[in-house]
Amino acid sequence: MESTLSLVVAIAAITICITAFAIYTAFGPPSKNLQDPYEMHED
């Protein structure tokens, strides 16, 4: 039972860390380095 709980907590922590990193990359200071392919392509 305790090993199951620790596994669930570990998976939840990894998921939260990945989500936080994605939000930081999308909206934080690194977002200035992201490029929009639709703005780069002119018709």
From Swiss-Prot:
InterPro entries in the cross-refs: PSII_PsbN (IPR003398)
- Keyword line: Membrane, Thylakoid, Transmembrane, Transmembrane helix
Q: Where in the cell? A: Cellular thylakoid membrane
The main place the protein resides is: membrane
What is the topology of this protein in the membrane according to its UniProt annotation?
Answer: Single-pass membrane protein
Q: Name one GO biological process term.
A: photosynthesis
Q: What is this protein called?
A: Protein PsbN
Per the UniProt entry, what species is this protein from, by scientific name?
A: Synechococcus sp. (strain JA-3-3Ab)
Its gene name is psbN
